[in-house]
């Protein structure tokens, strides 16, 4: 094959993206289909399955008991994200956790602790049996494990994982425990060095978390158009196949907004994003194409967050 033959696929892709940016002929600002179902894992205290487009994520919550109360509230909540075998094309069976998923888990944990559950520590304390409610000195705490399993990965992972985690947290409930001191004659013979034991409160009472906020994530990509237009186009919730085709030409981003429409988190990854970096933080009073594009993205993110939030509240 000569050099001209090697260039043909590149030329075809350039011609393809000149008139079509999405593989499924969907409008650039169209949201992916969203669905949610709770109570899907009987052995978890709270669970949910969420689909965003073709991406499917299952979230389950486990509760453990700590005989002490950590000073850092973030240490009471641990997020984990893993791929199931063959969750995406080209993936090996039983792959090692990728850096992308580890980074995404840290990102998810930060959003939950700082936005959705800023007062998580006060809700996870275990008090003494003789204590006077929440005014008593805590004798232990609950530790929440939020495990997200990606059944199928077609992009928009933060959109799906955050929604699944919120739905699972909202429906989570478990018996409230109290700490009782062990008798003195039993302390020396106890299997552990702890001098307290935890038992269910009488009468029975359930612990249910109260979410302070419902932050929602929206993934999008900014794709440069070919000359003579040479403009930037925003693609909302692109699939993984579309992101792979754009490669480094697209600037993939994630935007998280709360119920008041405030942007609480913004992340860029993937492409160089040179078209955005030059204009973020510039406020000279003049109207620019990138400025209007960013405002349009934020408006659409608020619209999407409102729709998904209503679905989650109705389903939980």
Where are these regions (language model features)?
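Polyanion-binding surfaces on beta-sheet-dominated domains and ring/shell assemblies
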Residues: 1-316
């Amino acid at each position: 094959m000569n050099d001209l033959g090697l260039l043909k696929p590149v030329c075809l892709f350039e011609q393809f993206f000149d008139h079509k940016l999405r593989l499924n002929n969907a409008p650039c600002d169209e949201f992916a289909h969203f669905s949610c179902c709770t109570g899907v894992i009987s052995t978890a205290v709270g669970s949910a399955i969420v689909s965003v487009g073709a991406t499917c994520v299952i979230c389950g919550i486990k509760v453990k008991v700590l005989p002490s109360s950590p000073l850092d509230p973030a240490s009471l909540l641990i997020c984990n994200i893993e791929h199931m075998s063959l969750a995406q094309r080209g993936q090996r069976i039983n792959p090692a956790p990728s850096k992308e998923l580890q980074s995404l888990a840290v990102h998810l944990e930060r959003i939950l602790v700082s936005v959705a559950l800023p007062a998580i520590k006060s809700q996870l304390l275990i008090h003494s049996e003789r204590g006077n409610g929440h005014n008593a000195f805590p004798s232990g705490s609950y530790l929440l494990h939020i495990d997200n399993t990606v059944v199928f990965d077609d992009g928009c992972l933060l959109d799906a994982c955050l929604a699944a985690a919120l739905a699972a947290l909202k429906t989570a409930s478990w018996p409230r425990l109290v700490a009782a001191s062990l008798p003195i004659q039993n302390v020396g013979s106890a299997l552990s060095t702890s001098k307290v034991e935890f038992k269910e409160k009488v009468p029975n009472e359930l612990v249910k978390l109260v979410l302070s906020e419902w932050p929602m994530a929206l993934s999008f990509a900014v794709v440069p158009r070919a000359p003579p237009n040479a403009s930037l186009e925003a693609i909302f919730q692109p699939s993984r196949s579309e992101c792979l085709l754009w490669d480094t030409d697209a600037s993939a981003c994630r935007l998280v907004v709360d119920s008041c429409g405030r942007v609480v988190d913004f992340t860029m990854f993937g492409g160089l994003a040179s078209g955005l970096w030059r204009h973020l933080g510039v406020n000279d009073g003049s109207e620019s194409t990138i400025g209007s594009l960013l405002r349009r993205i934020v408006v659409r993110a608020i619209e999407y967050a409102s729709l998904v939030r209503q679905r989650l509240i109705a389903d939980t």
